[in-house]
């Protein structure tokens, strides 16, 4: 019998045949994965190198040297320009095609005929300069009013291009031929343009030293070309001094303006008299001449002979109250009472000999029959802007006669200025819309009279530092008494500046002024802001279509739509109603998006806003992966610049106005940085503007509170980060500490999930609360409530843990309901799930809005006036700022010495209150009243002891309170001018502590 022996070879073969293929498949899979990883790393390295090269190229372009000034480039294609705009002469092109493209892009809204530009490079409260005061021969000015032109002497230096670029600053560039063409076309356009304006032509003349004068011509915007509305003759009359001192001259020059005379709803009840005044200095005395423009009215606008005809309250609309002054208070030199006149006064700071040049000897016969004794300003003379920027500041003298009211006459030396807020208000009566009034200062001119008394209760300082006063209400004018205090008198300029501080601290801010600030588009009243902030509105988010890597913009737009004050503001369409450039305005485009999102439920396309990205930032463009945090900063900065431009104020001299815009009240806050040198123990302190916070989350940080504690803890500056000490003149080790001094109403926190030189993303979970208490990180935070509520979260979804690629989604809250917005998809969500997300940006809204400290600092409570406060110690030193208050309060008294004790008590009460506010920064060892680096007020180097205060208050303040006038000295004159503010845009001086890192540190990019 055969025996079969099984050696197990078949089983071994079976096992080997099965295991070896499996091993081969596994090795092959591993090899493929490794190859894919190597390819991905190679791709990432190539991408990173391209990004670095592009960043270096952009940085080199950004910091390249300025081009030669005599080379002009086309604004469209940046080629060498060979021609220029035939109308404004300001923009140069390489061809007519580029000119047409630029015209359609928006130049048609900015192009204005060449006109006079008044240079004001060195402005102060005591000096005015017209153009370039070089004393050369002056040409003549042709005023196109009526059928025949009238020639008036004018300074040659005043003829310059308004919109000339900085490269055109040298006078050697423009040739004589271009200048001749400019002047000829200015006259031709004045004769043929659809909106008529003043044209000027120049011709040589001899050295006569005649005064530099300016006139404005008015024409109706609704008149037919064949019908003349206005006929005028110009004459020169000697007049009394327009300004008693050089300090009374206006502090800002006028911009040239093409204004129009609109048809009156009252059929021109009374026609004012237009005159031009100019102060001159001759042998220590002020002399002036007035150039009067006696206007005639055609049959289309008959002059009513009824003096009792009431106007439509033009000034009441612009200012909130109607103003009426008696003719007995303001008399002309000729002694003719009852002449109602409207004076346009232009001051010149140059001193030269003057001679009266008779321009026209004939006067209008209709003017003699014009009614006299009218006490109101007719609405027939309304200023409507047309095709140009409006007046920066215009001075209008309003001596208006009245046969019913009798006031004491004004002394000619006591000229008072009334500051009118530049508003854009318009009201309608009888179907007529009032045009925006662009007036900077209104001057109550007074002529010499036998009896001199003080007529009205005035105040001296406006919110912008100009010498101005506010006219009392019509009900208070009959028995009012003027207290004209010469702030430049005294034995020293220091006491004069202290007097100004006393005047400002002892007078409360009226509610009318706060309400009047709403007339400024860029000065947003806090009361209105608080109402918008706390207003509840039901608003469900609407999806936004991704138009090509636009998820970074969609999440920012969604969060801004639900920012508390902006939601109501844009839904009410407040901005678009006042904006003049709706097509090119980014804020108007965003407002349209918010309104459509409220009305429609289907997803919207943000393509209209994204097309303007090149106007927002140099690094942003369509189809590119961008960082949401960087884009948010650009959007906020753009909206802030729109508010600032709309306010039409020079922010370098009024930098505090940045905090009073809608965006400033919403996102604006302040950080304080303290650095102490460890070698010399010298401390330095810097206060910076803050629009958001960027906090580090690396290391052992796991919560938002940990990140904020690291942000505000003391840091040692050593190694490459050594501090350059100004005392040691070398780099030394130092201690640095950051603190939030003024937290914003809307706090935006960016978690720094990227690092310089690394491509990976910090994909760790950072827990954040729904309600944030910011008090531990705020200087003096225990005295106020700093509770914030979460309303928006932006999350970055990365691809392979990369920081420069991925996708953005956001979570937003409205009426305690949370929504998730993923481009065009919007679904509901819950807060528990949101708090566990890897957030990149957090949006917190303050539970109770708080005004800026600047407004709190300048407010004076009525109870503080009645309380007695002990005087400070005599040995205490303090620095007094020359321009502390931003309000324009009143200093009134019915008796010559009345209210003196209350003023002193209120002064020291305000002194201690301000000192207490500044002492909230308890870590500061500075003993001065105002820190030199503080943005609370302007800087000053004057220091005085309380002995000087006592000498000032009990010495010559009594004479000032009685309104005694003295001759101002040059020293006191120079000490009254406020030092100019120099400040850049908040985002232009960003620091890593304030705004996070720059684009070169690879922020998070977003894409599908």
UniProtKB/Swiss-Prot annotation:
Cellular component terms per the entry's GO annotation: membrane
Family: Belongs to the peptidase C19 family.
Inducing factors: Regulated by the transcription factors NAC045 and NAC086 and up-regulated by salt stress.
Name this polypeptide is given: Ubiquitin carboxyl-terminal hydrolase 16
Enzyme Commission code: 3.4.19.12
Membrane protein topology class: Single-pass membrane protein
Function text: Recognizes and hydrolyzes the peptide bond at the C-terminal Gly of ubiquitin. Involved in the processing of poly-ubiquitin precursors as well as that of ubiquitinated proteins. Involved in salt tolerance by modulating sodium transport activity and repressing cell death at least partially through modulating SHM1 stability and activity. Involved in cadmium tolerance by interacting with HIPP27 and probably modulating its stability.
Active site: 551 (nucleophile), 807 (proton acceptor)
Subcellular location: Membrane
Residue spans of biased composition, Polar residues class: 284-295
Gene for this chain: UBP16
Basic and acidic residues: compositionally biased ranges: 222-233
Binding sites annotated in the UniProt record for Zn(2+) 1: 74, 77, 94, 98
Subunit structure: Interacts with SHM1 and SHM4. Interacts with HIPP27.
Ranges of residues in domain USP: 542-847
UniProt tissue specificity: Expressed in flowers, siliques, rosette leaves, cauline leaves, stems and at a lower level in roots. In roots, expressed in the sieve elements.
Region of interest (Disordered), residue spans: 122-149, 159-178, 187-233, 275-309, 326-379, 859-905, 952-1008
Binding site for Zn(2+) 2: 85, 88, 107, 111
Root EC class: hydrolase
Bias type Low complexity, positions: 193-203, 340-351, 878-888, 965-992
Biological process annotations from GO: cell division; flower development; leaf development; protein deubiquitination; proteolysis; regulation of response to salt stress; response to salt stress; root development
Zinc fingers typed MYND-type, residue spans: 74-111
Residue ranges crossing the lipid bilayer per the database entry: 7-27
